[in-house]
């Protein structure tokens, strides 16, 4: 199950490009003023058209084995499969317009709206799975009201103050590119940044709040805010070009597919065994999300200016109580009916195969298996239909005739029956408390602008490895079925890999098997996260140069960031069972548990594990410990631009580049910023004339970190034109 690594970190390269574009001069807005001069306003509009093309071949490690690749998950590959042969992924018309009206600088209002229509998306121009109506509403066609607030400026005693009420964006801190810092007030649309020619203000989405600003003294100011609405971040929808999550985004498949890549999200065709297509084979369905209340978010900051420190230095102090905008995932164990039907499936397969082996005719063996399955299910709380029991009996008999493993087939079908009665859901924990410090200044000797911040968060929900969550959610099935089959049960914490209950004994979270007084299974919640304290550090330097490569001006920005999570449990010996506690990292589609690996056993493709995976003592593939979240993780971004004014007539030419590298460690999810070895680079050229017309063409490439870089094969070329008036 891959969930949230399509969050703020995904749009990293696009964010850099948008920020670099934001510092370009823009056209003067249409301004107006009343005859008296009391009323004044401005209206600014930008219309853009952009196209993007895929220019790299798909990486088989990011496509499930059952879908034609060599990867271990069918829950991340819809975006890849939709553009296997189709190179054009977007052809979008965009618009942003904003209107400001004010009276004597005392009060006024500001409104901003945006819109998008992507001809490629709306034309269902994909190779495999057309985007759903919900997904198209995110990346295909929409109009949005962004900011819409009123403001009042007044003196509170002798203190100049301002009150703003309504939908608005509040930016905190000093981070330029790297996410995870102090700028956590508003929510974010990752998809908006992937549109060629997009502007950052299209991705920073406002929430409804009241904001009070006041100048407490010559050098000290404060800001207080209270939010009365909440929205989650908008992630890439399932099937879009940049999507790496088929489970949780808009238009998702609404289910997690088990089987470590051996099972397709399109289902399993048992026709060769007489069973037909089973679309929901070994899937866990999605339950309704646990959405938080709208209220309960508030914060305050203070800014203090030191005029004599350097060339002037501003310090910032922050506090924010907020609700997570990126989801964590928890699971629900299955029902008594699911366990009963699983027992019925085992009996259908086994009885049919045994009857056939005993000399019965094929039709007679199927009848025996059908009856045995229904009786077993009914006796244990199940409701297996005659048609399903007959299907399983047919599969069991044909598996025997084909020389297959009847016991493994029975286990597969039983797992499928139980998993259908499970569930997973997203939740957004509340009352995360963030404390922060920031500074910005300028070095006297070189004129270099420097800025930095540190953000400390208390009770941050960190996502536990999803494979371990699934293992834990299957413990009632494993233990319950073993009891029904009168097999010995190994309890939690007593790891015997070759026993009847290896998951129960060896998984890192223990057993969730629980029954009532009548012995019926009780459904349990497998909490998908742990609350931890975290630190995020950020430092940025910006230098402007003259006469570089004959350019009018050159700008170079360097930003480094780091995440620190003290107290993470040992990955192999920590946690509640002493078998480790691993927090999720991107692309960890297998277990990191050396006692389980790819259980149910899934051997390596062609006898070899996919690169970076390693075999465990039982011949299965598993993830190395370095693939999961680490205590420290850090990376950096370098961005630069040359400016050639009037290079060709009135046209200005601006070559630009960005380089992003995650150096060491893995930031914990959801939405972790860093994954060691991951890189992204962009080179482009912008041409503008009279600050009204702008053309841009760029090439972006992703690399490093192997299958743990979920965008490793999404290199693209983008071109856009924008007209501002």
Where are the language model's segments positioned?
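Transmembrane beta-strands of outer-membrane beta-barrel pores
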Residues: 49-55, 115-119, 167-171, 226-232, ...
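Short loop/turn motifs that connect adjacent beta-strands in outer-membrane beta-barrel proteins
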Residues: 27-43, 56-58, 99-109, 151-163, ...
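Flexible, surface-exposed loop regions and adjacent strand-edge segments
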Residues: 60-66, 126-132, 179-186, 229-230, ...
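Outer membrane beta-barrel
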Residues: 105-256, 635-637, 656-658, 664-665, ...
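Detector for outer-membrane/organellar transmembrane beta-barrel domains
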Residues: 88-90, 94, 320, 457, ...
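Membrane-embedded beta-strand positions of outer-membrane beta-barrel proteins
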Residues: 43-45, 111, 163-165, 212, ...
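Outer-membrane beta-barrel "beta-signal"
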Residues: 713-725
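Flexible glycine-rich, low-complexity coil/linker segments exposed to the extracellular/periplasmic environment
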Residues: 61-82, 237-242, 249-292, 342-423, ...
């Amino acid at each position: 199950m891959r969930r949230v690594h399509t969050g703020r970190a995904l749009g990293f390269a696009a964010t850099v490009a948008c920020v670099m574009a934001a510092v370009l001069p823009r056209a003067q807005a249409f301004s107006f003023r009343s005859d008296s001069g009391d009323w004044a306003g401005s209206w600014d509009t930008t219309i853009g058209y952009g196209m993007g093309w895929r220019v790299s071949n798909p990486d088989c490690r990011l496509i499930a084995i059952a879908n034609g690749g060599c990867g271990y998950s069918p829950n991340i590959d819809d975006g890849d499969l939709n553009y296997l042969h189709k190179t054009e992924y977007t052809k979008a018309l965009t618009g942003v317009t904003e209107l400001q009206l004010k009276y004597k600088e005392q009060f006024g209002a500001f409104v901003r709206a945006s819109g998008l229509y992507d001809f490629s998306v709306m034309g269902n121009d994909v190779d495999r799975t057309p985007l759903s109506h919900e997904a198209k509403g995110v990346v295909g066609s929409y109009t949005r009201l962004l900011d819409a607030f009123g403001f009042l400026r007044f003196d509170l005693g002798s203190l100049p103050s301002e009150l703003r009420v309504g939908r608005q964006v509040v930016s905190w801190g000093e981070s330029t590119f790297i996410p995870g810092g102090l700028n956590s007030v508003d929510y974010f649309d990752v998809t908006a940044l992937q549109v060629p020619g997009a502007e950052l203000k299209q991705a920073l989405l406002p929430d409804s709040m009241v904001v009070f600003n006041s100048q407490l003294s010559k050098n000290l100011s404060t800001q207080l805010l209270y939010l009365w609405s909440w929205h989650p971040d908008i992630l890439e929808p399932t099937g879009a070009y940049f999507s790496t999550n088929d489970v949780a985004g808009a238009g998702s498949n609404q289910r997690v597919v088990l089987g470590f890549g051996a099972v397709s999200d399109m289902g399993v065709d048992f026709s060769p065994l007489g069973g037909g297509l089973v679309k929901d084979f070994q899937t866990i369905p999605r339950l309704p999300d646990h959405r938080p209340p709208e209220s309960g978010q508030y914060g305050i900051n203070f800014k203090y200016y030191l005029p004599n420190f350097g060339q002037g230095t501003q310090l910032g102090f922050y506090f924010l109580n907020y609700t997570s905008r990126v989801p964590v995932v928890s699971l629900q164990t299955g029902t008594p009916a699911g366990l009963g039907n699983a027992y019925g499936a085992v009996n259908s397969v086994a009885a049919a195969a045994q009857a056939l082996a005993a000399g019965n005719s094929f039709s007679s063996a199927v009848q025996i298996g059908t009856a045995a399955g229904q009786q077993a299910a009914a006796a244990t709380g199940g409701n297996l239909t005659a048609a399903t029991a007959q299907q399983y009996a047919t599969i069991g008999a044909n598996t025997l005739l084909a020389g297959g493993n009847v016991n493994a087939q029975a286990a597969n079908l039983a797992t499928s029956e139980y998993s259908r009665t499970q569930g997973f859901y997203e939740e957004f924990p509340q009352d995360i408390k963030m404390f922060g410090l920031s500074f910005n200044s300028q070095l006297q000797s070189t004129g270099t602008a420097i800025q930095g911040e540190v953000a400390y968060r208390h009770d941050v929900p960190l996502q536990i490895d999803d494979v371990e969550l699934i293992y834990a959610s299957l413990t009632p099935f494993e233990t319950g079925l073993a009891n029904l089959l009168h097999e010995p049960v190994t309890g939690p914490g007593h790891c015997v890999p070759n026993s009847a209950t290896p998951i129960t004994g060896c998984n890192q979270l223990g057993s969730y098997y629980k029954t009532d007084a009548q012995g019926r299974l009780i459904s349990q919640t497998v909490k998908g996260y742990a609350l931890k304290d975290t630190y995020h550090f950020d430092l940025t330097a910006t230098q402007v140069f003259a006469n570089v490569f004959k350019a009018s001006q050159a700008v170079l920005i360097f930003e480094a960031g780091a995440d620190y999570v003290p107290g993470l449990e040992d990955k192999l010996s920590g946690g509640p069972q002493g078998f480790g506690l691993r927090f999720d990292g991107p692309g960890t589609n297998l277990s990191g548990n050396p006692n389980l690996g790819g259980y149910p056993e899934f051997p390596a493709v062609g006898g070899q594990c996919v690169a970076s995976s390693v075999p465990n003592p039982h011949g299965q593939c598993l993830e190395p410990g370095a693939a999961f979240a680490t205590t420290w993780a850090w990376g950096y971004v370098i961005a630069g631009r040359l400016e050639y004014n009037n290079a060709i007539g009135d046209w200005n030419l601006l070559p630009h580049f960005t380089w992003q590298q995650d150096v060491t460690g893995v930031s914990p999810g959801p939405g972790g910023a860093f994954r060691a070895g991951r890189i992204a680079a962009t080179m482009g050229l912008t041409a503008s004339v009279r600050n009204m017309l702008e053309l841009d063409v760029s090439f972006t490439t992703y690399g490093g970190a192997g299958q743990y870089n979920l965008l490793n094969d999404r290199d693209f070329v983008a071109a856009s034109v924008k007209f501002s008036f």
